[in-house]
Amino acid sequence: MTFMAKAGQVERKWYVIDAAGKPLGRVAAEAAVLLRGKHKPTITPHVDCGDNVIIINCAEAVLTGKKLEQKKWQRHTGWIGNLKTTKYATLMAQRPTKAMELAVCGMIPNTHIGRAAETRLHCFAGAEHPHASQKPEVFEL
C-alpha cells in the first residue's frame, strides 16, 4: 500500500547550506529540493513535506561565466514606464540575499505549497544566523 502523508505527520528538519565559493544556481537547486521535500521517501504531492533551509554566506556565492555583468533582474513598480532593471553585479554587491531568494524561488512552483515553502527559506549574507537553537544539520553540496 502506498504511504500518503498527512499535514500533521510531517517532521521538518533544519538544514544549513554554506554558499561560500559555490555557484549560485547549484546552491539554489539543492535548497529548492530540500524546501519541497523531494529528498524524502515519504513525499506526498498534495502535502507540504519540505524542510527548513538556512543559506549562509550568500555574499560569497559566485556566478559563473559573464553572468555577473550580463544577467539582469527586472521588476515593475506598477506605474507606466517604470520597469526597473538591475545588473547582478549591483544586486550581489547591495542585496546578496535577494539574489539567492530569486534563484531559489524561481525553482519552486507558484502554488500554495510553493509559497509555503518559500517562507521556510532563510538567507543570510554572512556566516552568522539566529537559528542555532533549532540545531540545523550541515548540508554538503
Residues of each region from the PLM?
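Ribosome large-subunit tunnel/peptidyl-transferase-proximal elements
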Residues: 1-102, 112, 130-141
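C-terminal structural segments of small proteins and small subunits
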Residues: 101, 105-130
